Structures are given as structure tokens and as C-alpha cells.
Curated annotation (Swiss-Prot):
Reactions catalysed: 3-phosphoshikimate + phosphoenolpyruvate = 5-O-(1-carboxyvinyl)-3-phosphoshikimate + phosphate
Family: Belongs to the EPSP synthase family.
Naturally occurring in which organism (per UniProt): Opitutus terrae (strain DSM 11246 / JCM 15787 / PB90-1)
Record-annotated membrane-spanning stretches: none
High-level lineage: Bacteria, Pseudomonadati, Verrucomicrobiota, Opitutia, Opitutales
The name this protein goes by in its record: 3-phosphoshikimate 1-carboxyvinyltransferase
Gene Ontology process terms (BP): amino acid biosynthetic process; aromatic amino acid family biosynthetic process; chorismate biosynthetic process
Pfam families assigned to the protein according to its UniProt record, in alphabetical order: EPSP_synthase
Length: 431
């Protein structure tokens, strides 16, 4: 059933119980799709995410000539016919919507292709997201990448002739996806490639890329430096089946839910911190510190490495026992929306005292203002984070006190989020 434009959040009146089957990781699904497309044999991805972002990636790979068979009930994506890719004689148009992973990865893939003309564009918000670091690096490796409207941004037109390899520098300060995209296509170059990072970067996502590439048969030599990476020219080769981990960022909402409403939730298959490929699994450690802090004590958390989860914590700070300072989030001003400014605005609308700087938020809990509507700015993480806050029975009678505008934006990464939340609420009443 389609979600309404304005969704009142029905609070939990009893503690949550049960378990949640999490969707597959978006970051891993789109990386694995790219690497599977670069193998020389069919690859089946199990536990894959089915959402707008991954569907955009799948649609683009099909337009590039690959076969991708999607079985949503089984949560599998089968990639084959790699030899048929990049054969089109006419220009190929690719649409990436607002999917940052698809946008960056496909740009690098098309630049590394042996032939063809590729035009890549997205929605208006995507045209504001940074691409310059990747574009400059691809050009330095011999790619012809044209920015057809504004330099450093979409839309792009790529006249492919492969990459020559050799030394190249990249500034990935605006998004680690820029570096990950370059790393994944570097083995396609005609000669070994030495990539030197010239900026700070979120290492958890880069480490994810390193480890996934290794599982697909390509290892990276750090060349005696933590910021220079060398890759020989070669091909990827993966097992015929590859399992995608459950999404650790999506898990953060359901890890926070028991803190808001009481009870316990099981999240089958979710890897603990340090065990899997996803840095966002460390959010559970943040919640442990939230629970342990003394009443009135300032809690400070640096989210630089796990910034996709900062909204989960920020949204529930009105319920916490003291002020919270969230740092390391300046780069999130250039994601789906300006997440720092948006979060400050919505919390203040709910009556909270918020101090906002370039890369920090400090929230001082105040009595919640009831009957407000949360603007999501088309950003799925705003919708899901504030939905968890709305699950607290603030009125004490089970009546909704908070509404979410455009809840359907969750389709970007977690299409059935609100359905799962409603199921958990009903189950809590039955227990």
C-alpha cells in the first residue's frame, strides 16, 4: 500500500519484542554489482538490497549490455554476459537519480570502458553533489570526461577509450565514494596504477572497498604508505555466489528503538563491530555509551567514520539524560541534503536547544513540542530517524504526536521500513 504524503507515527505503548530481518547493505550491494560486472563469469549476489539506489545501478548495468536477473523474493541478483558490455555504437544514457554510489561507480566504470559514449545524469539534487575529485583523477589517467553544464558536476558525457594507468592523485575529502570508485576500476587500466590520496577520507568505507576487492580476487599494495595504493592491471574473479551482509546503517534504527520504547530486538545476521565489512556496525558502541553516561553529563561522539548513523542518534537526543555533542559531520552537508542544517532545523522545531557549527551539533534536551511535522528534504535518513523518535509515547495515551512528510523517500534504501515498524508495534500489543 502506498504511503501517504504525511504519515503520523503511532507510538509504542508497550516495549518492543521480536526480530527484524534487515535489508542487504546498500554500500555492499552496489559495490558488488560493479565488481561482478567486471568478472569474466556469472556471479550471483545473495542477500542483496532491493531499493531505488540498487535498482538504478541494475538498470544502468543492463543499459551497458550486461544481463542482471533480479529475484526480489529470494533477494538475489545474478550478473552475467560481461563480454557483451560496452558494445553499443550509439551513445548510452544512464540515469542515477540521487544514488551517490551508482553515480560515482558508474562514472568510473564508463571512463574505464574500452569504447563508447556515455551520458550520465541524475535528479536536480544529484547535480549539486561533488564529482570533481573523481573527474580530475580519471582525466589524469587519460579519460575524456566532459561536464556538459557545470564543471565538476553532473551531467557528464564520457567518450571512453580506457585508462592508461600510472601515477594519479585524488582529493576524496568530499566523499569516500570518489576514491572507492577509482580504486575499483584501476585494475582495468592498461598498466599498473598508483593512486595517491591528497585529502582526509572516511576510512571505514575505503576499507570496505579494499576488503571487497580482495574477496573478488584483486589485492591492493599500499606501496609503503597509508595514502598511496598500487594496483596491477588484471581481471576480477569472484566465487560464483557472494553473500551481502545485512545493512548496518539500517540496523541503527532498530538498535535505537529499544532505547526509545523499552524492550529488546534481535537482528539476525548482523555482524558485530569489527567482524564484517561495515564500519557503521560501531553504532551499537555509541548506544552503549549513551546508556552508561550519568544524568546531566555531556556526551560527545565523533561520527566522522560512521556519519550515516549520526541522524539516528541526533533525532532521539530530546529523550536522553543530558546534552549531546555530535562532531565529525561537516561532510554530510553535501549528501542527499545538508544534513547538519536540516537536523538542527527539525530539532529546534521540536523545541530543542541546538548549537550548530560547520561540523558539529550540540543538542540540549527540552520538553518536546507536540503536533509538529518533520520535513525530510527527500532524505531517507531523516524519515527513519525521526520515526524512531515518534515511537515514544510522549502523550501517554498512544496518540501520535509527530508526523513525517514524504515517508516514501525511504524507498531509496529501505522500502519496507514503515511496514516493519508497524508490524513490531502490533506485535508488542499482542505479547
Amino acid at each position: 500500500m502506498p504511503l501517504p504524503d504525511l504519515l503520523p507515527i503511532a507510538p509504542f505503548t508497550r516495549p518492543v519484542r521480536g526480530e527484524v530481518t534487515l535489508p542487504g547493505s546498500k554500500s555492499l550491494t552496489n559495490r558488488a554489482l560493479l565488481l561482478a560486472a567486471l568478472c569474466d563469469h556469472p556471479v550471483v549476489l545473495t542477500g542483496a538490497l532491493f531499493s531505488e539506489d540498487t535498482q538504478l545501478m541494475v538498470a544502468a548495468l543492463r543499459r551497458l549490455g550486461l544481463t542482471v536477473f533480479a529475484n526480489e523474493p529470494a533477494r538475489t541478483l545474478a550478473v552475467s554476459d560481461q563480454a557483451s558490455a560496452f558494445q553499443a555504437k550509439a551513445p548510452v544514457d544512464l540515469f542515477v537519480g540521487l544514488a551517490g554510489t551508482a553515480a560515482r561507480f558508474l562514472t568510473a566504470l564508463c571512463a574505464a570502458a574500452p569504447r563508447g559514449v556515455y551520458r550520465i545524469d541524475g535528479v536536480s539534487q544529484m547535480r549539486k553533489r561533488p564529482m570533481r575529485g573523481l573527474i580530475d583523477a580519471l582525466r589524469a589517467l587519460g579519460a575524456e570526461v566532459r561536464c556538459t553544464e557545470r564543471e565538476g558536476f553532473f551531467p557528464l558525457e564520457i567518450h571512453a577509450r580506457g585508462l592508461r594507468g600510472g601515477p594519479v592523485e585524488i582529493d576524496a575529502s568530499e566523499s569516500s565514494q570518489l576514491l572507492s570508485a577509482l580504486l575499483m576500476v584501476a585494475p582495468l587500466a592498461r598498466a599498473a596504477t598508483q593512486i595517491t590520496l591528497t585529502s582526509d577520507v572516511r576510512w571505514t568505507f575505503v576499507e570496505m572497498t579494499f576488503r571487497l576487492m580482495a574477496e573478488f580476487g584483486v589485492r591492493i599494495d599500499h606501496a609503503g604508505s597509508s595514502t598511496t595504493f598500487e594496483m596491477k592491471a588484471g581481471r576480477y574473479s569472484a566465487p560464483s555466489r557472494y553473500a551481502i551482509e545485512p545493512d548496518a546503517t539500517a540496523a541503527s534504527y532498530f538498535q535505537a528503538l529499544p532505547l526509545v520504547v523499552g524492550g529488546t530486538l534481535a537482528l539476525p545476521g548482523l555482524r558485530p563491530p569489527g567482524d564484517g565489512l561495515q564500519g557503521d556496525s560501531a553504532f551499537v558502541d555509541v548506544l552503549a555509551r549513551v546508556r552508561a553516561r550519568a544524568a546531566g553529563q555531556l556526551l560527545e561522539e565523533n561520527f566522522h567514520e560512521i556519519s550515516d548513523t549520526f541522524l539516528t542518534l541526533a533525532a532521539i537526543t530530546p529523550l536522553l539524560a543530558g546534552p549531546t555533542r555530535i562532531t565529525g559531520i561537516a561532510h554530510t552537508r553535501q549528501q542527499e541534503t545538508d544534513r547538519v542544517a536540516g537536523m538542527a532545523r527539525e530539532l529546534m522545531q521540536l523545541g530543542q536547544r541546538v548549537v550548530e557549527t560547520r561540523g558539529e551539533l550540540e543538542i540540549h534536551p527540552q520538553p518536546l513540542r507536540l503536533g509538529e511535522t518533520i520535513e525530510t528534504y527527500g532524505d531517507h535518513r531523516f524519515a527513519m530517524s525521526f520515526a524512531i523518535l515518534g515511537c515514544r509515547d510522549v502523550r501517554g495515551d498512544g496518540r501520535p504526536w509527530l508526523s513525517i512528510r514524504d515517508p516514501a523517500c525511504c524507498a531509496k534504501t529501505f522500502p519496507n521500513f514503515f511496514e516493519l515498524l508497524a508490524t513490531l508495534r502490533q506485535k508488542s500489543l499482542a505479547d
